[in-house]
Structures are given as C-alpha cells and as structure tokens.
C-alpha cells in the first residue's frame, strides 16, 4: 500500500455529526476530498444541504441528543468512518450556571457522542471494521482561562474517557475509536471570545504558536485518525492546540 493509499478513503462511507459548519464542515470536506462519500448529520438544514451538494454527499437532519433518532438513521446507514463532532459551548461561572444550561451542554457534547457511538457502533462491530473519531477539546484535559465554562470542560473530559473505554471494548472487533482535542480554532464557536480582547489576548499569550488553529488543520488530523495510516491507533486523544497544553 502506497503512502497515498494509506490516507485514501476511496470507496468508504463517512457520517459526520455537526458536519455543516465550522470544524465539522472542514471535516466533511476533507473526508470527501480523501474519497469518502460523506453524509452530513446536522440540525442546520440550509448549511448542511448546501455543503452536502457541493461535496457530492448526503444530508440528514439529526438531533444527536435524541437516541431514537440516531438509531433510526443507523438502520439505514452503516458508515466505515463515523465522526461524532456535534457540540455547543456555554460560558457562565459555576455558581451562576442554570441547571437547564448545564444539562443542555452535557446532552449535546457528551450524551450526543454516546448516542452516536451507541447507535452506529454495533453494526460496525458486527461487520468487523470501522474508524470512529469523536471531537473533544483541550478543555477536556486542562481548565482554561479567563472564560468560565465548567459544563463544557466537564463534558469534554467525559468524552475522553468514553472514547478510551469504548476503544478498549471494540479493539478486537476491528473498530478503532479515537478523539481529537482542538485548541482555540477560528470558528463561530470562538467568535465571542475572539471579540473580547481581555479573553483573546490571554488565549494567544498561553498558546506557544501564538495563533488560532484553522479548521482545516483539525480536519487533517481527523483524516489521519480515520485512515489506514492510523491502523494501530485506538483509544487515543490527539491534541491539536498549538502547544497550549504543553505549558
């Protein structure tokens, strides 16, 4: 197998939750460029259908917090590559977080990943092959400052252990499960922080490379984990943060 072949996804079916915008859109585009037929599963019908059309893929409207909805889609699609990327952010001090906001963040960012793995994983395991990548965050490894976001951080830390646990369970079935942990990236989710100099200056001061990541850089790392080039990698959280967590 050539180097190009090891990174190719030709002939494979990929499903990307939260794949319509931001990092998810970059992942969808990168997997398609690598040869996969991509199904974008997202709540944003307008952006999702438009991107799927450009990529020659498919769009499904999906709420990852609804397990039954995930299971219904899984009855129709058994992907070779599964990317659980859907996520939201919420900034509030712990002593002020409304319990409903806490539950919403956990429901999307942690339970949504579980629902995705639980719905699509069994058929992949039964088939004996597949690659799953879940979007975590450097915030699942370290607390960040100055923005308060305990719910987000807790959810992403949960994703890391969910990935490791599931990877161990599925390792001998031929299904690999890994996570990507982006640092500060130039997407809509970081727009609020980037517009606040008192936050953004701290972000850049504490990022050794001194810049934001680009969605494409995160997507390229996802492609690696999905590809045959990562065939002996499972249960890993790959941090792509410009050196933030190295300090």
Predicted regions: what they are:
Residues 114, 211-240, 245-246:
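C-terminal substrate-recognition "lid" of short-chain dehydrogenase/reductases
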Residues 117, 155, 163:
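Active-site helix of classical SDR
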Residues 93-94, 98-106, 199, 203:
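Substrate-binding pocket helix/loop in short-chain dehydrogenase/reductase
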Residues 45-46, 62-72, 99, 216-217:
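The beta1-alpha1 cofactor-binding region of Rossmann-like NAD(H)/NADP(H)-dependent oxidoreductases
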Residues 171, 176, 233-235:
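Short, small/polar-rich loop/turn modules that mediate ligand/substrate recognition or access, typified
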Residues 122, 168-169, 231:
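Alpha-helical segment proximal to the catalytic Tyr-Lys
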